[in-house]
Amino acid sequence: MREKKIDWDDVTDEALHTCLLSRTRRVARVVTGIYDQELRPHGINAPQFTLLVIISRLDGATRSEIGRANNQERSTLSRNLQLLLENGWVTEKAGEGRNKPIVVSAAGHRLLDRAAPAWRTAQAKTRELLGTDGVAAVLKIADELATQ
């Protein structure tokens, strides 16, 4: 059987206009930019803030537990976690092998206290940008993905 020739104009149109990956990444970049802009004066960016919040919530979790909670692969987590460690916002307690508990330091808690209003401003701007239906859709999809 002869293979059907691919119409690259159709493929490129579809990839540029309806590709779910590129569209969700575009939304993520715009939203991340909003949070980064608000958090920048505090010396932290959106992914670092989120990671710091997760570590605060898990209080003493290991790297693998934090990675699972943040849905991050080990190399990405290590890179982001290293920045938090270098800035003194988290500390790694003594433990066996890779099972060292990680906790937010006093400096990290002060940073969260200072940056929380900026995060709330970013939340409000993002809610306004996405609208009620957009926010509901994002939250619904995120909740559904979390259970998979």
In which residue ranges do the predicted regions lie?
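Short, locally clustered residues in the helix-turn-helix/winged-helix DNA-binding domain
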Residues: 25, 53-57, 116, 143
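N-terminal leader segment of winged-helix/HTH proteins
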Residues: 1-42, 110, 140, 144-147
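Charged, amphipathic alpha-helical coiled-coil/dimerization segments
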Residues: 64, 82-140
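The alpha-helix within a helix-turn-helix
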Residues: 67
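Alpha-helical linker/hinge and terminal dimerization helices associated
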Residues: 27, 31-34, 70, 111, ...
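Short capping segments at the starts of secondary-structure elements
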Residues: 58-62
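Short alpha-helical "packing" element that flanks the helix-turn-helix/winged-helix DNA-binding module
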Residues: 48-52
